[in-house]
Regions:
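Basic, glycine/lysine-rich polyanion-binding surfaces/domains
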Residues: 1-123
Length: 123
């Protein structure tokens, strides 16, 4: 067994999307099937322009009744602006989240369901 090494992804930023329309809202915007997202399985997805050009990529985590999106700080403001633009009359709340951190792990790690959310990066 190898000792795990943690690297803090200091360029990661988070936002949350919650509300009764959050599932449908994300399903209509992103490049992955939001229904595959669960507490134990995060998704890697993208937001594209109406012409199909890349705007942002992110990971999506499901936590209770809300979704957490993690993206690079370079794309964060653009992503937040576009999601708020597309919100229209959807019953969703989009909020910035400041108390979360992202880490890359190298080596073996035992999964503790209560304290860690992790999966293999599909990129």
């Amino acid at each position: 067994m190898t000792v795990p090494y943690f690297y803090k992804n200091s360029n990661s930023r988070f936002l949350s999307i919650e509300g009764e329309d959050s599932n449908e809202f994300l399903q209509n915007l992103i490049t992955n099937d939001i229904n595959q997202c669960s507490k134990d399985n995060f998704l890697y997805s993208c937001l594209l322009t109406p012409q199909g050009k890349f705007l942002s990529d992110f990971f999506i985590f499901k936590e209770d009744e809300k979704y957490l999106l993690e993206t690079h700080s370079f794309f964060y403001e653009k992503l937040l602006k576009k999601l708020n633009l597309y919100k229209l009359r959807s019953k969703v709340n989009i909020k910035e989240v400041y108390n979360l951190h992202s880490y890359s792990v190298f080596g073996d790690l035992q999964k503790d369901q209560d304290t860690l959310i992790f999966n293999i990066d599909p990129r």
